[in-house]
């Protein structure tokens, strides 16, 4: 069952406010940027979901990454950063050459994601300086590799389907669901830490 875009936007906004309260200096505009990104992603839909039913796939969204035991804010920042980084890759590099997205919406979406990544990277650097985050690739949180594998499955699916319009629609919807779930699960986890 697909949730309405406005409902998803509201839930992501709640999750983003929790990310903003992690203690690093993420500006208040971070929540607004996330809401806008989800709205744009919803507006980018090109096909009705019913026309792509035969192409649906279970990508095994790693729910435990967002609901697991992440006791450090560095881990939470890392998960959010990797998620945004991978979404940026899909829509701002891979999609730009193989999907017929509305150019105006795509540019605004990519610009907003780029701003989010810049702000998240500043927070990750702050955590490194405070000794809370890993300095080397060998120290990457296991959640990061789980997320990378999830996004790799999405990428392989697009390749297998030869970047068809339905494949892109399935991936776009999957990423919207991922943003929705990650935001609500992350918010719940952060509230339990208070």
Curated annotation (Swiss-Prot):
GO terms for molecular function: cytokine activity; type I interferon receptor binding. Glycans are attached at residue 102. PROSITE patterns: INTERFERON_A_B_D. It is found in: Secreted. GO terms for biological process: adaptive immune response; B cell activation involved in immune response; defense response to virus; humoral immune response; natural killer cell activation involved in immune response; response to exogenous dsRNA; T cell activation involved in immune response; type I interferon-mediated signaling pathway. Pfam families: Interferon (PF00143). The keyword Oxidoreductase does not apply. SMART domains: IFabd. Belongs to the alpha/beta interferon family. SUPFAM superfamilies: 4-helical cytokines. It comes from Felis catus. Keywords: Antiviral defense, Cytokine, Disulfide bond, Glycoprotein, Pharmaceutical, Secreted, Signal. This is Interferon alpha. GO terms for cellular component: extracellular space.
